[in-house]
Amino acid sequence: GRGQKLSASAVKEVALANNIAVEQPVTFKKSSAEGLAARQTLRTYQPDVMIVAAYGLILPIGVLETPTHGCLNIHASLLPRWRGAAPIHRALLAGDDETGITIMQMDKGLDTGDMLYKVSESIASDDTAASLHDKMAALVATAISTVLKDLAAYQAQAIAQNDSQANYAEKLIKTEGEVDWSQPASAIERQIRGLTPWPGAYTFLAGQRVKVLASL
């Protein structure tokens, strides 16, 4: 959070307020005592299904196979386009006019699992990464509840991804925010919107770093 202070996520706050147990494993690796303990804790819940969204850990196959119906991932793109860590930002940077949400059955690959459900969202000419994130977040509750209400049917009709159509949304790094003024104006405009709020576009003026908040 602000001031580099740790704060609970909204999900954790709601769970604690309703006396729902919260587990926050730091690893699932078999090579560590913490990882083995986390796997054992997961098994004690005997989960029917797990839902994963923007989770920071790689889930090994042993974890993916623990729930009766496996693990579902809510991914912020229309797979197989923009697999990976930063699909919203990369869609904006590339000038895509549409993106969306995909609910997929997780496997050992990186966003490579079979697709159960997709819903599209148009990208407006003034969308930033922040505004597009919020528009897509509004789609998630309906999407995942729709799938869970008839999970067996959606899993039976799951569609395999076409790997030949896949591309990857690489994780953002801060230096991507520096504006290269030799680029076309359209590319710079997308850079400003696609990197708002983080890492943010910037340039240097008289030796000083200056934030670029918008284009005209």
What are these regions (language model features)?
Residues 1-197, 208:
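One-carbon transfer enzymes
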Residues 205-216:
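Short, solvent-exposed recognition patches
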